Amino acid sequence: MHPLPSVALLSAIGAVAAQVGPWGQCGGRSYTGETSCVSGWSCVLFNEWYSQCQPATTTSTSSVSATAAPSSTSSSKESVPSATTSKKPVPTGSSSFVKADGLKFNIDGETKYFAGTNAYWLPFLTNDADVDSVMDNLQKAGLKILRTWGFNDVNSKPSSGTVYFQLHDPSTGTTTINTGADGLQRLDYVVSAAEKRGIKLLIPLVNNWDDYGGMNAYVKAYGGSKTEWYTNSKIQSVYQAYIKAVVSRYRDSPAIMAWELSNEARCQGCSTDVIYNWTAKTSAYIKSLDPNHMVATGDEGMGVTVDSDGSYPYSTYEGSDFAKNLAAPDIDFGVFHLYTEDWGIKDNSWGNGWVTSHAKVCKAAGKPCLFEEYGLKDDHCSASLTWQKTSVSSGMAADLFWQYGQTLSTGPSPNDHFTIYYGTSDWQCGVADHLSTL
């Protein structure tokens, strides 16, 4: 990691307002700022989405680093692909942004019920042909929406060839955003592939869980606890620096359906004000960077009072109040998840009431509702089919089953027992039959 610019250098940069300072963004498809770097620095192309001011004599660079402090100062290092290898084909798919239209979504000029899926692992593939194959199959099936991870946080640099998006270093108290070939360029390819096929992406920006680092990766580098993550000023400044890097990168892409603040945010034992205040602040920040795309919470939908049976998911035990969070001014639609087995619910038909409860809250708020994750381990059809029918009849805007699977060049995609593999008998009863009714 290069050292941060000196005070003298920063002062010199401030005197040249029309030029970009060291390691600053100087180009890219979504970029509208200055393109000229300060003396001694050159604007270097990473890919069609991102160019950065690098030392004029540098032949290789690395990832963009953000300090924990709210300062905009940053450092970087990472291998820069040549313009010929990093340039992606010009997308030819749909060109309109997804919008809310009453209690439904308008996608490519159509306001109706949509179906989709989750494939969290897609940006972590290193073979472009595998990404293309997944997108081709989704397009053939008629699955219009894909939710995939926009985060991958580590506390130490992984082995060569392993994809990661951010390195939170506990030894230095710094965070490095990886914009290289094993970093955000993998997400670049997913976005580009989705654009060409008219697939719309939902992208959460941090994980509540420790998979792929999550909030605890920040805590390990900056201290505090997971429940303090939402209010820790150092952590939030680093989180917002990452938001800015990703959201600005794809601000003009029609492939993005919406940004999600997190995947399944929880703050066990906290006042619901903690998550609400963070939701309101962060969603407003995203909208200030990107007015083109919608914003959602990405949460499980816990803390519902409408038709509550008093069970764990309806409670605010995890610090979340669904209606309260949905009411945040810059949240465009509601999302919720359904996992009866994981929540200790014995009767799968309970899920139908869970769906209709959320539909009622969304209707009262005047915002669409997305049945964002649902599934059963191994038994992929019995209850899921009923949940899907309830989703359609209750006025939901769309549903996304968890999760999509297929054979890749390296073998089967991840199987967490919820996975429904493309072309199998479970695919027919759990996915194709549902799509045929829409």
UniProtKB/Swiss-Prot annotation:
Residues 60-96 are annotated as: Ser-rich linker. GO terms for molecular function: cellulose binding; mannan endo-1,4-beta-mannosidase activity. Belongs to the glycosyl hydrolase 5 (cellulase A) family. GO terms for biological process: mannan catabolic process. Has a modular structure: a carbohydrate-binding module (CBM) at the N-terminus, a linker rich in serines, and a C-terminal endo-1,4-mannanase catalytic module. The genes for catalytic modules and CBMs seem to have evolved separately and have been linked by gene fusion. It catalyses: Random hydrolysis of (1->4)-beta-D-mannosidic linkages in mannans, galactomannans and glucomannans. Residues 61-92 are annotated as: Disordered. This is Mannan endo-1,4-beta-mannosidase F.
